[in-house]
UniProtKB/Swiss-Prot annotation:
Descriptive protein name: Uncharacterized protein YcbP
Domain of life: Bacteria
InterPro entries, per the entry: DUF2512
Locations listed in the record: Cell membrane
Source organism: Bacillus subtilis (strain 168)
Segments crossing the lipid bilayer: 11-31, 34-54, 60-80, 89-109
Gene field: ycbP
GO cellular component, one term: plasma membrane
Length: 128
């Protein structure tokens, strides 16, 4: 249940951030933004929140989330954007990734306070 709650919080944060930046700022549709939210949310939760954050620290996990957000938004944004140049999509991805990184930095405090991901990390570390 803790993962469901964490994913819900992350999903709400991500859809709000991406719609404000990409939808209102760059003209992406809500459907495109929702699709990016789902893909980015699942990948960043598994890699950033459950693997990188428990293993290293908040700053490293935030930097990883920034890079991941930029890549996902840029790569998904290229075919989804109508009439935007590659540079415009990259700019949208940069702004989206910056705001997502700020949100992820705060979200990581929630993850650490609930020790979500820590148990999995400790189990895999003691198994080897």
């Amino acid at each position: 249940m803790t993962h469901v709650k964490a994913l819900a919080i992350k999903g709400i944060m991500t859809i709000i951030v991406l719609y404000l930046v990409l939808g209102l700022g760059f003209g992406f549709t809500f459907g495109d933004t929702l699709l990016m939210t789902i893909v980015l949310g699942v990948i960043s939760y598994l890699l950033g929140d459950l693997y990188v954050l428990p293993k290293w620290n908040n700053m490293i996990a935030t930097l990883a989330d920034f890079g991941l957000a930029f890549l996902v938004i840029w790569l998904m944004g290229m075919p989804l954007s109508m009439g935007m140049t590659g540079g415009e999509v990259a700019l949208a991805a940069l702004f989206g990734a910056i705001v997502m990184a700020i949100g992820e930095y705060c979200f990581h405090f929630y993850m650490m306070s609930k020790e979500i991901g820590k148990k999995h990390y400790l189990e895999t570390r003691t198994d080897s």
